[in-house]
Amino acid sequence: MEKTYLPTVSTADKKWYVVDAENQRLGRLATQIAMILRGKNKPTYTPFMNTGDFVIVINAEKVTVTGNKGEQKLYRRHSGRPGGMKTETFNHLQERIPERIIEKAVKGMLPKNALGRQLFRSLKVYAGPDHPHAAQKPEVLSIQTIPGAKS
């Protein structure tokens, strides 16, 4: 009887991908990124191990949402002090810290445990078109999040 194959940390083949977020829909882009971070696109996927790849997201400042979400979608954070709840809209946060929008969307789609925190560290988000990871030789990954558009 053969044993079931289990990948190990040493056999894990981690690749680096670059994703351009320009004119992409936020939620659809985040689901694809979360799948790559978890490694669900690989035949060696194991639920309790980090078998995923690294993802670099560029042009985070140009990600879009549909409808009135720009004015209506709220991002909340709390300082921990009484009355310390801060709320801001998608448009305001996109002007201030555009990286945080994609980070928050992807983080919510990862497991809420130690593995999820480890997977989240494999995500690198940059507001502009430049990134400092050229030494890793990342592959360009085209993700099409606009329904009906040609890739």
Curated annotation (Swiss-Prot):
Single GO molecular function: mRNA binding
GO biological process, one term: translation
Pfam families given in the database record: Ribosomal_L13
InterPro entries in the record: Ribosomal_uL13 (IPR005822), Ribosomal_uL13_bac-type (IPR005823), Ribosomal_uL13_CS (IPR023563), Ribosomal_uL13_sf (IPR036899)
GO cellular component: cytosolic large ribosomal subunit
Alphabetical UniProt keywords: Ribonucleoprotein, Ribosomal protein
Family annotation (CDD domains): Ribosomal_L13 (cd00392)
Subunit structure: Part of the 50S ribosomal subunit.
Family classification: Belongs to the universal ribosomal protein uL13 family.
Function: This protein is one of the early assembly proteins of the 50S ribosomal subunit, although it is not seen to bind rRNA by itself. It is important during the early stages of 50S assembly.
This protein's name: Large ribosomal subunit protein uL13
Organism: Acaryochloris marina (strain MBIC 11017)
